[in-house]
């Protein structure tokens, strides 16, 4: 991850999106162009969102995230591999697109695995964001509600990718 890449809070709008990513990856693997993928998703309402605008926005977000993988075999794996495997690749795509998630996974989760520390709690998220706010003016300028939402999203991503059993878990799972 390029450290000149800015921190962005778009995660509040474009969270994990596993099922959307899987649908988009299937179309991409079938050889559809990016524009044709968006058109197909909108026309078939594959994401089951209420408005065409939201479907289009999320389809483009998924395409951007899949392109961040820079590997057609990983895109194909999201489309065709078992859910647990596909979710790990989707997490990797999210990490490649979001410096915030990249650094959280490396500095918090990665460090815990390295130290064989299975504990995890709100304090880990709080410490990560406090440290980040001290180090980065952009993150420091985010509202408390944005920070809270990002913490919730990261925790949900950890549950969805089975790093945590549930949102109240105080121990990491073995992945």
Describe each model-derived feature in a short phrase.
Residues 1-88:
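Eukaryotic partner-binding/assembly regions in large regulatory complexes
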Residues 21, 101-102, 122:
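Short, leucine-enriched amphipathic alpha-helices that occur as contiguous helical runs
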Residues 51-52, 130-150:
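Short, positively charged loop/turn segments that connect secondary-structure elements
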Residues 59, 63, 151-156:
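Short, hydrophobic-biased segments on the C-terminal half of alpha helices
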Residues 88-92, 96-118:
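Positively charged, polyanion-binding regions of nucleic-acid-associated proteins
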Residues 122-130:
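An amphipathic alpha-helix signature
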Residues 159-169:
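A short, conserved structural fragment
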Residues 174:
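Conserved small/polar residues in nucleotide/adenosyl-binding loops
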């Amino acid at each position: 991850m390029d450290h000149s890449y800015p921190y962005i809070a778009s995660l509040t709008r474009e969270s994990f999106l596993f099922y959307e990513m899987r649908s988009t990856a299937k179309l991409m693997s079938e050889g559809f162009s990016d524009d044709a993928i968006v058109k197909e998703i909108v026309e078939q309402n594959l994401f089951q969102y209420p408005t065409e605008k939201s479907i289009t926005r999320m389809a483009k977000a998924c395409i951007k995230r899949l392109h961040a993988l820079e590997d057609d075999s990983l895109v194909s794996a999201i489309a065709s591999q078992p859910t647990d495997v596909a979710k790990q690749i989707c997490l990797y795509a999210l990490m490649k697109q979001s410096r915030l998630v990249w650094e959280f996974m490396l500095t918090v989760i990665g460090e815990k695995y390295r130290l064989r520390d299975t504990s995890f709690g709100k304090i880990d998220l709080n410490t990560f964001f406090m440290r980040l706010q001290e180090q980065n003016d952009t993150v420091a300028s985010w509202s408390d509600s944005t920070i809270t939402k990002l913490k919730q999203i990261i925790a949900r991503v950890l549950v969805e990718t089975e790093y945590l059993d549930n949102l109240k878990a105080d121990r990491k799972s073995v992945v």
